[in-house]
């Protein structure tokens, strides 16, 4: 402790679990701000922040597969499609050969349609059916979760080369196709969820990278500052105080 390289905070994850997974809810069992999909009150709170009908998130109350489980199922031929971003799983997953295929039918990675977002060739892109060229961290706006749990905002320095795009652009383009024809109340589902940043008809963000990043950050801040959203505040002010205590 208190020696170089011996700090109390872990450098966790693939690639940054405290910044891109725990805080924003990309784990299969998590919602943003370390809330849990299995906790009904956490789901109601998240619905209030995202302006979703009560019960909308109940469909995900049973967590999906964690990473190792997902790759185990992939090796059995039970995963039809996998899309990876921000990590090089073919390099970092332990004993990858066990995922290449097992059992009489020898199913595995080669039976799964794999999409990889990357900036240069890696072991993961060698297994990919489709590689989407994306921007490096200096070629777009973004945040990074530091070991001491502060969030650092980094600014775009240069344009991405060629046809490379912000990862978020690829997610938006797939999302509006997946949600095509879906409604939340009387509103188009994609526009309800993402219309504040993205114009699906123009296939582009409504603002520049900096403003888009700011809008997303301000939305995320509500999870730890319910005063910014009256509906979320009402749920946070529970009678026994347990929910508010967990948030703090």
Where are these predicted regions, by residue range?
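Domain-level signature for respiratory redox metalloenzymes
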Residues: 1-116, 121-248
């Amino acid at each position: 402790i208190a020696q170089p390289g011996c700090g109390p905070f872990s450098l966790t994850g693939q690639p940054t679990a405290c910044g891109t997974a725990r805080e924003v809810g990309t784990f299969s069992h998590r919602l943003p701000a370390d809330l849990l999909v299995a906790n009904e009150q956490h789901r109601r709170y998240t619905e209030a922040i995202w302006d979703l009908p009560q019960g909308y998130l109940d469909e995900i109350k049973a967590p999906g597969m964690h990473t190792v489980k997902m790759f185990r199922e992939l090796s059995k031929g039970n995963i039809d499609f996998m899309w990876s971003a921000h990590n090089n799983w073919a390099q970092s997953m332990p004993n990858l050969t066990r995922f290449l295929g097992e059992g009489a039918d020898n199913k595995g990675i080669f039976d799964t349609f794999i999409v990889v977002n990357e900036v240069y060739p890696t072991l993961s892109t060698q297994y990919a059916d489709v590689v989407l060229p994306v921007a490096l961290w200096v070629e777009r706006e973004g945040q990074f979760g530091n070991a001491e749990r502060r969030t650092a905002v980094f600014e775009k320095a240069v344009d991405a080369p060629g046809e490379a795009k912000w990862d978020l652009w690829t997610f938006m383009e797939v999302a509006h196709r997946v949600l095509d024809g879906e409604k939340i109340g009387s509103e188009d589902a994609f526009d309800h969820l993402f219309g504040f940043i993205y114009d699906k008809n123009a296939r582009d963000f409504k603002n520049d990278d900096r403003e888009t990043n700011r809008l997303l950050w301000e939305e995320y801040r509500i999870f730890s500052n319910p005063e910014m959203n009256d509906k979320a505040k009402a749920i946070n002010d529970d009678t026994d105080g347990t929910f508010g205590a967990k948030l703090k």
